[in-house]
Design a protein with these regions (language model features):
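Conserved alpha/beta-hydrolase catalytic His-Asp/Glu region
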Residues: 136, 141-142, 158-215
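Conserved loop-alpha-helix segment in the C-terminal half of the alpha/beta-hydrolase fold
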Residues: 221-257
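Catalytic histidine-centered segment of alpha/beta-hydrolase-like enzymes
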Residues: 256-265, 269
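Active-site loop/oxyanion-hole signature of alpha/beta-hydrolase fold enzymes
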Residues: 60-102, 106
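Bacterial Sec-dependent N-terminal signal peptides
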Residues: 1-24, 220
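Flexible "cap/lid" loop of the alpha/beta hydrolase fold
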Residues: 125-160
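Conserved hydrolase catalytic core segment
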Residues: 97-139
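Conserved HGGG/HGGXW glycine-rich cap/lid loop of the alpha/beta-hydrolase fold
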Residues: 28-73
Length: 278
């Protein structure tokens, strides 16, 4: 009986510990105007540190990192909605006002989601290579109901050997940046990620459709895109995806891939600084 009580106690402690895991981790730096830096899928908040160093004027950075990535304990699914919920709670608790949101990829999705809910607290938004509805571009015509956690592709990814997953990570990293040293870094982030978060979290992203929220966002928005495969394909996609935004500027980088901060850093800094100075 005593042994049973001890085991039960350990189970409760373990369960409570998992339940209390935070969906986000935030590192602060600097002072003055709050800038919430939202990285993309698998990326840590530190991916934005060089951008922060190159911002003109005084800013207080909030570098966000996500559960399940970069050594942060995973949380139960659904994942994306938990990130958004905790970010909104963080902003309210910290009483942040006149916030600049800067988000890459999935971070751009979170920026849209946050601005739609807390519009009176947001001053400007910078979205870097993010789509409001990925599945429309990647898998047009596929209904949202088709995206479930339990599906053959997800199960294959969850059960993949380390070698097979590393090969997949290598190919994906090569498609995200032209910088070979950064490809190695991206591959490392993917391999070190909690596998279930990596697989199921991406399913969460495929379910997203933020287009209905765009009309509620009144603040200026800068949308920066990578010219891959080419500008003639990319620009119409961005224009269509963000047609609901009333106050937007869209610019496409001269070259590079998804991680614009790696492939075109000076162009990125110039675009953001010009936008924030208006």
């Amino acid at each position: 009986m005593r042994k049973f009580i001890v085991i039960l106690g350990l189970m409760i402690v373990t369960a409570n510990t998992f339940a209390q895991n935070k969906a986000i981790r935030i590192e602060e730096a600097g002072q003055d105007t709050p800038v919430l830096f939202l990285p993309g899928f698998i990326s840590p908040g530190t991916v934005w540190k060089e951008t922060f160093k190159n911002l003109e004027g005084k800013h207080k950075a909030y570098f966000v990192s996500y559960a399940g990535f970069n050594g942060i304990e995973p949380i139960p699914m659904p994942w994306y909605s938990a990130l958004k919920k905790e970010l909104v709670e963080y902003i309210i608790t910290k009483k942040l006002e006149k916030i600049v949101l800067i988000g890459h990829s999935m971070g751009g999705n979170l920026a849209v989601d946050i601005a739609a809910e807390l519009g009176d607290k947001i001053d400007r938004i910078v979205i870097v290579d993010a789509l409001t509805c990925m599945r429309e571009v990647m898998m047009p015509g596929v209904p949202v109901e088709s995206f479930q956690y339990d599906n053959p592709y997800n199960n294959q990814m969850l059960n993949a050997t380390d070698k097979a997953f590393q090969q997949t990570a290598t190919m994906m990293a090569q498609g995200m940046t032209l910088d070979t040293s950064k490809q190695t870094l991206l591959k490392k982030w993917m391999i070190e990620a909690d596998r279930k978060t990596y697989v199921y979290g991406y399913t969460d992203l495929l379910k997203l459709d933020l287009r209905p929220l765009l009309s509620s966002i009144k603040v200026p928005v800068l949308i920066l895109g990578a010219p891959f495969p080419d500008k003639e394909v990319v620009l119409p996609n961005f224009e269509k995806q963000y047609v609901g935004l009333a106050n937007k500027t869209i610019a496409i980088a001269p070259s590079g891939r998804h991680f614009i901060m790696f492939d075109q850093p000076q162009w990125l800094y110039a675009q953001i600084n010009t936008f924030l100075s208006k």
